[in-house]
Amino acid sequence: MSVPTVLEKILARKAEEVAERSARVSLAELETLARAADAPRGFARALQDQVKLKQPAVIAEIKKASPSKGVIRENFVPADIAKSYEKGGATCLSVLTDVDYFQGADAYLQQARAACKLPVIRKDFMIDPYQIVEARALGADCVLLIVAALDDARMAELAAVAKGVGLDVLVEVHDGDELERALKTLDTPLVGVNNRNLHTFEVNLETTLDLLPRIPRERLVITESGILNRADVELMEISDVYSFLVGEAFMRAESPGSELQRLFFPERGVPVSGSTLD
């Protein structure tokens, strides 16, 4: 019997989590909460508007820990981090809500969104329509669909549920086969290329560059994972990739927003402040 990969372990636990949550709060109750939630802020539109100007469209991630790195940030106050990111020039936020493997929480998404005006994606392993409705009830503006975690029928079902509740969809791929499935199954304009292999958690920036020629121009490409310095940013920009999802590089910095500005908007200079998060 083969040893389960990291992704397989996460998905097995996620199925248990969905069962536990749906036993506590029914889908009908969630749908009521979703209808009462603040209107979506337009996640895809915000990225598209920035990319049209050939300016970095940064999805700044709020992430306390990961399976591969353990705890990434000890001083973890989502509302303060969100404000710092907004000040530093982020276009959108990504908030980890997975509890068991990333030490995330639903409350972190709510706190971050309430602290700023940026659109927010719920970063989690979505496998069930329940989670999609739950995301909207929490106030999310977008959800992540990971092709490696879903078959085509479920992927299409989740995207349809997302559209029904007013959520944008970011579909995430890692290789050519996943990209082909995503393009065939979904019409979302947002295609994220994860440079991290979710089975091994190894990172290679060439993943984005290799897949880029196969992605239609009308789709917006977001490079995810492994962007750590200006050279990485410039490598993507010369290839006409202007949207980035970055977490660890910011989370390890004393001031996440200042690090965002340093990496993506160096011409603005880095703000000097007494606060570690300003």
From Swiss-Prot:
Record bears the keyword Lyase: yes
Catalytic reaction list: 1-(2-carboxyphenylamino)-1-deoxy-D-ribulose 5-phosphate + H(+) = (1S,2R)-1-C-(indol-3-yl)glycerol 3-phosphate + CO2 + H2O
InterPro entries for this protein: Aldolase_TIM (IPR013785), Indole-3-glycerol_P_synth (IPR045186), Indole-3-glycerol_P_synth_dom (IPR013798), Indole-3-GlycerolPSynthase_CS (IPR001468), RibuloseP-bd_barrel (IPR011060)
GO molecular function term, any single one: indole-3-glycerol-phosphate synthase activity
Annotated EC: 4.1.1.48
Pfam families: IGPS
GO biological process: L-tryptophan biosynthetic process
Name the UniProt record assigns to this protein: Indole-3-glycerol phosphate synthase
